[in-house]
């Protein structure tokens, strides 16, 4: 947290510093799911801005024609008021928005190295469970996971932070698991993304 002048406003983490005051700024987790249509992100962002909430982190995707978004925003509006303000967006029942107050945790520096795991092969039950179990047993923390079924082909891409020195052992275990599943898997170190 930094303050350069007695009346300068600076927001760092989950605290807001202003003219001789220090107070906590709430963080809210907002999830929106439902039938995809153009304008959902704009509609949600406008409601949050109108309430004075600052959108900090977000992710959004389409899952087999369904819209799914999770975001974190900061401000001083109770979660029930935010949920009520979002309710008109789902008037026809095609969207569901939920809001929950969360504790600010800040960014946690990874203790290991980031890796990218890619898998493709014939779809079958248990692929995600088997691959993520290998990563979990090694102490890996999955930071992003995307899966997609395209016809009979199943694709999985995961970003994972692995403990120092664990890359080769994890690669060996993933190769064994991939053989059992009848899929192809690769793992490689990757650079930390800006986003």
Where are these regions (language model features)?
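A conserved regulatory-domain signal marking ACT and ACT-like small-molecule sensing domains
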Residues: 20-195
